[in-house]
């Protein structure tokens, strides 16, 4: 799956919760964020490819990527036994829209939440949208996906 934008790319790299195949950067970008992403990618052994903006646009669903994209795999599920030790844990239920889910995660992280339990829903198809709408919070915040929410909280 493709993660778009500097904030999402940095969050995926720094959280280290999913495999990363490569990063593609607009060859005309030369700002601080881009320099950080390139340096961190080299440190982590991630391949960085420079490309024309048009090529990057063609790979994405829109043009809000800012010239930076990351190819990543599925996120590892956080362990429930570690999450339940948290002082501030939240159970989110009934959220279907990936943008709203991302906004909730961003607000929870800002409020000091240390973990989130959610029911099964295929968020993997929307991971890029969730990461972007959460401002990267979805990558940093421990999340446990429960098959049965009632059993998860007992």
Language-model segment annotations:
Residues 81-154:
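RNA substrate-binding interface of SAM-dependent RNA methyltransferases
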């Amino acid at each position: 799956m493709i993660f778009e934008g500097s904030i999402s790319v940095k969050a995926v790299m720094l959280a280290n919760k999913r495999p990363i195949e490569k990063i593609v950067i607009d060859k005309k970008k030369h700002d601080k964020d881009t320099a950080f992403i390139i340096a961190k990618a080299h440190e982590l052994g991630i391949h960085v490819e420079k490309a024309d903006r048009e090529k990057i646009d063609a790979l994405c669903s829109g043009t809000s990527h800012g010239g930076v994209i990351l190819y990543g795999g599925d996120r590892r599920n956080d362990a429930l036994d570690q999450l339940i030790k948290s002082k501030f844990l939240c159970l989110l239920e009934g959220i279907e829209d990936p943008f709203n889910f991302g906004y909730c995660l961003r607000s929870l992280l800002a409020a000091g939440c240390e973990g989130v339990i959610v029911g099964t829903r295929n968020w993997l198809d929307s991971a890029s949208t969730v990461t972007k709408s959460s401002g990267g919070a979805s990558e940093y915040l421990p999340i446990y996906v429960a098959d049965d929410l009632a059993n998860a909280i007992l």
